[in-house]
Each structure stands twice: as structure tokens, then as C-alpha cells.
From Swiss-Prot:
Protein name per Swiss-Prot or TrEMBL: Acetaldehyde dehydrogenase 2
InterPro entries reported in the protein's UniProt record: Acetaldehyde_dehydrogenase (IPR003361), Acetylaldehyde_DH_C (IPR015426), NAD(P)-bd_dom_sf (IPR036291), Semialdehyde_DH_NAD-bd (IPR000534)
Keywords: Aromatic hydrocarbons catabolism, NAD, Oxidoreductase
Gene name for this UniProt entry: aphF
SMART domains documented for this protein: Semialdhyde_dh (SM00859)
Length: 307
């Protein structure tokens, strides 16, 4: 298929730069713009060297070019604080917004759990939750699709070197958004999320712990089978997603211990937390793009809200 859907990325930091590398390999997506606010940023320089158009004037520098350059999908890898305004401007021009910040103004999307239902929903903004959410929510969902989960708790441990300034400013949003998605997408009645930023040298690979309390005695065989099935689904787009231990059963508690190794596109392989986020965003965009190219999905501009 030679035809591709054109994309723009807002935020040339760790996540935006890693995502750009993944989009360049995509059979259905073509990145054409990288948007930043600092003309001297490494991310913008790198994008220019790759032949990508750049602007250091923020999203307003992109808007006049969207129609001419045929941009239909925009990724926001900036901060929760500016996302709503970015999304509004992009949606008004008829482009789909894929949100990699914890802003969560659109529906949560965790590809192996609920991506299919978003494709026909007419949503013009989908939120990729957080790196911790992408790594752990599939496992909560794997348990909850077998039997009711009263409580789900996730702990994401990431290397300090892989956590950029945007993520550090959004720690509270990270925990709130992830906990909310553990409930809404994972299916737990109550969710909790904890992030640990580890300064150890050499840097540690991303590790995730998932605890689920089931309402009834856990069906160990069915839950184990469900977890391994879900593991295989995530590995389709994140090959370094591994089950280190578990599921471990202790009364009604089901525990799963995971490790996520990145592909090493931009950041080293220990930054699996960024890799799972960018891989999930690319996978989501590809599914939307395939529908658009097949004529099954047409994007429509979102009318501005009257003041």
C-alpha cells in the first residue's frame, strides 16, 4: 500500500523523538511535521536532519500548514497542562488527536483491551493513559475478563534517566490518570497507581507490579491462561514486554511481575516505559489510518465551542 496518512508530532522530547522513529517505519503513516517551542532543541534539530518540517512556534506554527500538507493525525507528547488547547485547535481542522500526555480529555485507549471499540466511536481525541498504564492495564483486564476484580493496584518503576521534564511535571496527573484507567479500562472496581523513579546507575529496565484482589476465590487456571493470552497480544507491538514472575496467587490476591525492554529506537533499551507508550500510540494511529485508507472512517472538523 503506497498511500499513507500524514501525521504531525507536537513535542520533540524523549517521547516525541522515539515516536518519530517508529512512525518512519510504518506502512500506513507518514510523519511530516515536528512541533516544538525551542528552536535549538535537539528533537527539532534531529527531525530537520530527517527531512521533517519543523516549527518552534508551538501548535500555532503548525495550524496554517495542516490542510496544505494533508495532516490527518496529530500526536501530542507535551504536557497535560497544554493538551486541551492543542487538541481543540487540531480537532477544529479535522485532524484526529492522539494524546500521549496524562490530560485524558478523550477516552482511554489501551490497544489490546479496547482499541477496536474506539475505531467506530467517532472519537476525535484518544488518550494513551500513561506508560505505567500501557504496561499494567492489559494484565488487570486479563484478570477482570475472567472474574470480578474488587481492587487493582499497579506499581511502575522506571529509570530516572528515562523520565523527562514533561513527565516530572505531571506526576500527580500520572497517578490519577493511571488509577482511573485501571478502573475504566482494566475493569477493577477501585484502582490505585504508584510511580517510582529510580536513580540507580546503571539505569534499571522498566519494572511493573500488578496486584488484583478478586471478589471470589480466583480461578487459577482460567486467569493464568488469560494472562498469557494478553501477554502475547502486547508482545505483537512491544516485543520486549515480558512476564518475569506470576501470576502468583495468595488467597484472593493475584500478582503479576513484568519487565519492559525498549527497542532502543532513540533512548536506550532500559527506557521500556517510553517504548511501550510510543509503540501503543503508533499501533493506535495505524489502526485508525487503515480504516481511513479503506474508506471506512472519515474525520470531520469539530466545531469550535461558543464562548
Amino acid at each position: 500500500m503506497s498511500q499513507k496518512i500524514k501525521c504531525a508530532l507536537i513535542g520533540p522530547g524523549n517521547i516525541g523523538t522515539d515516536l518519530l522513529a517508529k512512525l518512519q517505519r510504518s506502512p500506513v503513516l507518514e510523519p511530516v511535521w515536528m512541533v516544538g517551542i525551542d528552536p535549538d532543541s535537539d528533537g527539532l534539530k534531529r527531525a530537520r536532519e530527517m527531512g521533517i518540517k519543523t516549527t518552534a512556534e508551538g501548535v500555532d506554527g503548525l495550524l496554517p500548514h495542516m490542510h496544505v500538507d494533508g495532516v490527518q493525525i496529530v500526536f501530542d507528547a507535551t504536557s497535560a497542562y497544554v493538551h486541551a488547547e492543542n487538541s481543540r485547535k487540531v480537532n477544529e481542522r479535522g485532524a484526529l488527536m492522539i494524546d500521549l500526555t496524562p490530560a485524558a480529555i478523550g477516552p482511554f485507549c489501551v490497544p489490546p483491551v479496547n482499541l477496536i471499540q474506539h475505531l467506530g466511536s467517532g472519537a476525535m481525541n484518544v488518550n494513551m493513559v500513561t506508560c505505567g498504564g500501557q504496561a499494567t492495564i492489559p494484565m488487570v483486564a486479563a484478570v477482570s475478563r475472567v472474574q470480578a476484580v474488587a481492587y487493582g493496584e499497579i506499581v511502575a518503576t522506571v529509570s530516572s534517566k528515562s523520565v523527562g521534564p514533561g513527565t516530572r511535571k505531571n506526576i500527580d496527573e500520572f497517578t490519577r490518570t493511571t488509577a482511573g484507567a485501571v478502573e475504566k479500562v482494566g475493569g477493577a472496581k477501585k484502582g490505585k497507581a504508584i510511580i517510582v523513579i529510580n536513580p540507580a546507575e546503571p539505569p534499571l529496565m522498566m519494572r511493573d507490579t500488578v496486584h488484583c484482589l478478586t471478589e471470589d476465590e480466583p480461578d487459577q487456571a482460567a486467569i493464568t491462561a488469560s494472562i498469557h493470552q494478553m501477554l502475547a497480544e502486547v508482545q505483537k507491538y512491544v516485543p520486549g514486554y515480558r512476564l518475569v514472575n506470576g501470576p502468583v496467587f495468595d488467597g484472593k490476591r493475584v500478582s503479576v511481575f513484568l519487565e519492559v525492554e525498549g527497542l532502543g529506537d532513540y533512548l536506550p533499551k532500559y527506557a521500556g516505559n517510553l517504548d511501550i507508550m510510543t509503540a501503543a500510540a503508533a499501533r493506535t494511529a495505524e489502526m485508525f489510518a487503515e480504516q481511513m485508507l479503506a474508506g471506512k472512517l472519515t474525520l470531520a472538523p469539530v466545531a469550535p465551542i461558543a464562548a
